[in-house]
Design a protein with these regions (language model features):
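Residue-level detector of short coil/turn "hinge" positions at structural boundaries
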Residues: 6-7, 87, 123, 143
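Conserved beta-alpha-beta core of the PfkB/ribokinase-like small-molecule kinase fold
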Residues: 48, 52, 60-131, 151-153
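Short, acidic/turn-prone active-site loops that include or flank metal/cofactor-
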Residues: 39-41, 92-94, 113-115, 167-170
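Conserved N-terminal subdomain of the carbohydrate kinase-like
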Residues: 1-60, 78
């Protein structure tokens, strides 16, 4: 297409509307709560993934999240992983994954709330993030990146772990909507460029 986005696997549903998300923003903190109505995205099937499998196999990075049916997302992850494509999973919204799926994830990028879901304890400190990352690595994830909002990011794999502070923009946060999406997009681009 004119902006360089491959839309060859785009399908239009005659039966279902485009998914929508109602986003409520706290004016004081900029934090949000999101209510999603998946629409057509909730109707994606394994057959749709089969139709797009060649695109997945030719990709440098496979980035996905959990707003589509879980069995379909896990199926797509399996295709990417079995073809040695780096998989980034942004587990939003947090949902129970099959144990085997964790070992197919190259980069697992939950925020602190999502990470808490998978390790069953709150993440409020760097030490909590370190403990959670180690638990996720024990499940089979290769690299864990827990985003901690204005506090920064915690990274861990079997060889190293570190915390990085968030940039201080010295301005008021108006709305955090899309912060995780932007982070994951930036990560995917950086990893793809590193492969070139």
């Amino acid at each position: 297409s004119e902006f360089g986005v491959n839309i060859s696997n785009l399908t239009i549903s005659e039966k279902h509307s485009t998914g929508v998300a109602g986003i409520f923003v706290n004016k004081k903190t900029g934090e949000n709560a999101i209510n999603v109505v998946p629409g057509a995205a909730g109707k994606i099937t394994k057959s749709d993934i089969d139709n797009a499998s060649q695109t997945i196999k030719e990709s440098e990075i496979f980035l996905t999240q959990l707003e589509a049916p879980l069995d379909v997302v896990e199926y797509a992850i399996e295709i990417a992983s079995s073809n040695n494509i780096d998989v980034i999973l942004n587990p939003a919204p947090a949902r129970k994954l099959e144990q085997k799926t964790f070992s197919m994830i190259d980069y697992f990028t939950p925020n602190e709330t999502e990470a808490s879901f998978y390790v069953e304890h709150k993440i409020e400190t760097q030490e909590d993030a370190k403990k959670a990352a180690n638990q996720l690595i024990d499940k089979g994830v290769k690299n864990v990146i827990i985003t901690l909002g204005e506090k920064g990011v915690y990274f861990a794999n079997e060889k190293q772990n570190f915390f990085t502070n968030a940039f201080d923009f010295k301005g008021k946060v108006v709305d955090t909507t899309g912060a995780g999406d932007g982070f994951n997009a930036g990560l995917a681009v950086a990893l793809a460029e590193e492969k070139k």
